[in-house]
Amino acid sequence: MRITHPAANFFSVAMGKQSHQNFPSVPSAPRSAASEPAYRTLREYTPFAHWKLLLGGVLAFHLLMALLRFDAKVSIGGDDSWYIIAALDFWNGVAFPSWHGAFYSILISPFVAAFGIHVPILKIFSILFSLSAIALLGIAIRRYLPPTVWIFSLLLTAAAPEMVSLAGSTYSEPLFMLLQACIIFLFLPLCNLTAPILSRRSIAYLLSLGLALFLLALTRNVGYGATIALVIFLLSIRRDWRKALALLASFFIFFTSFAIYKRLKWGVTDASFSGQLSKMMLVDFYDPAGDKETFWGLCVRVWQNAQQYLAFHLPGFLGIKMNAPSVILLSILIAAGIAIIFSKRTRSAFTWFLATYLIVMLGATFLTQQVQWNQFRLVIVYLPLLLAFFLYGLHSALSKVSPSMGNIGVTVLCGLSLLFTTSANVRLIDPLNLSKNLRGDQFAGLTPDWDSYLHVCQWAGEHLPDSATIACRKPNNARIYANRPFLGVFRYISDDPDSTWAYFNGQRVDYLILAHLRANPQQRTERFINSLHFNAFRLLEKKPDCLELLYYQGSSEPAYLFRINRENLQQSDPERYRRALEAGLIIYPDNFDALHKLALFALQQQRRPNDAVMYADRAIAFANRDKKSIPYPILEVKAMAIYLLGDPHQAATIFEQLAEADPNNPSHVYNLALCLQNENPTRAHQLFAKAKRLTQQNQ
């Protein structure tokens, strides 16, 4: 069904009419418009002139922004590094890339094998994927939207700073968007196809669509939702169960064939998302032994994710920066979506298709993703469809006031958004760092925390044996820079030091990298990613000399490489023992046990009582800061040091406090007597006798 809409005038007046014959024909629906309800019909708008020129302009703009903002480094997120590493492992026969989605890693594996880990080349492929996605989607939906809505849906997507950033990345989202566009390009003509279901043309459409759906699911696990969405649409809106069953059959042909390949070649017997589905139910993704989400907990998760993605990130894509997610905005979007679906003016098969697809895909995303992950790339892949849906509703509502008001209103609002996003892109252009990156400087443009961390990782790759196990928090990024594997430790293991040691011993960890990676990558605050630091605390509580500093980088936000020591250094190498205690204080500065041992070492091994007092005072300061009682060994060693410095009176004052707190401790009584033997010989003699008596009683 083709209609002439007031929106067509916006372009036809400016550029003239274009003959219908200039567009590829789409077969009419099996039923006539008279017998089929309007909302089940894929309405087509009168074609407008020069659409290819406009689409080319959008693509040129997106390419220009992507090139100007090109970043030759991998991102600090880590997932994009995983795809590259997985591609290398897949090509070398090490492992099948089954965690984040396999297709992107499989697709780039020949290029990684040919060129090595050459990030700029891989990012050029992502730019091509992004451009192709916008182009193919534009071709696929141009018949079903008013021209103004069509062009701005594509243009605002191309201009979104996050989209430009993603286009020049090694994440799988650009490929996902290309496959998504391919699905829409194939599915919409299939809906109106009149040929028999077993005809050559129908089978070609169905097999192509089944392959695209399978590859989408293989790219990101949420892609399985696309098949569900299309089947729901065919059954509920189109009432075409034959095509629905045929589409499912086509999908499972490819799914089953690939499952057989995985089992025979790689020994993989489960679907790639099975592990994620089990972890989806966890309250804390990084605590497998923790609580499972309840039904109400999942509902809360969906609502919170909807808030942060639709009422925070979505406005940000359009240049509207929010301080926090807006419940009011989310409520408006939900109400507007319902109105668009059910309003007679906007209700059509195409709007129902968009609604069905977006509800299923966004719903699956909001249900499966932990709230704290909060990654914009999870929803930006749906940005052009969201824009098409809501701009169409806005255009129709304004056109009800005046035939030209829809075009004017959409143009003004989208023009302002385009101004904001383009300005944001221009501000993010950094030609100096790009030039350095392309000349081989992998670190140019990194924030100090990441610069320190990756320099340490690179040093470890160059100086440590390949057989060593190095634990760190961001292993994928580390491997890209060091060209060697790392062990990722992402969670806090236990409050029990023995359990933490058991984990590190079980993993045979030889070295540990600790860095101050910012919790907020854009701003340095006191908060940093510290789960691995807390694990180090537990190691140090059990053995204060377990960390030996090998290398560090950075001053304001440093990173450290430690060797994990399991030897008895106190007996075998006293000086190395002292250095290890000092190294532990870098990470755990208020470790009373380490400070006490260092104070004793200064007294007994170095004969440096001033250093002993310094360590004791540091421990006392930490105790006062935290409003804790001062451990008596700290006071004892301080008093001993003060005595050796020639101040028995002050030392006696401290030992007096200790003896009063624990009158049956012969050591305190003896030391007090020792301090008083010149100042008060009589009392000192009595205390020596008491200390001797207490010692005999305790034997």
Give names to the regions the model predicted.
Residues 393-396, 410-450:
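Transmembrane alpha-helical segments
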Residues 9-10, 20, 35, 39-41, ...:
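Perimembrane helix-loop-helix junctions
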Residues 134-159, 177-178, 199-200, 406-407, ...:
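Transmembrane-helix signature of polytopic, membrane-embedded enzymes
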Residues 166-167, 173-179, 216-220, 225-228, ...:
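Hydrophobic/aromatic-rich transmembrane helices and adjacent perimembrane loops
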Residues 78, 99, 122-129, 152-187, ...:
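Multi-pass, polyprenyl lipid-linked donor-dependent membrane glycosyltransferases
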Residues 65, 243-331, 335, 361, ...:
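Membrane-lumen/periplasm interface segments of specific transmembrane helices
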Residues 135, 235, 308-351, 355-358, ...:
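Hydrophobic, aromatic-rich transmembrane alpha-helices
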Residues 71-84, 95-110, 117-120, 267-274, ...:
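Extracytoplasmic catalytic/substrate-binding loops of multi-pass membrane glycan-assembly enzymes
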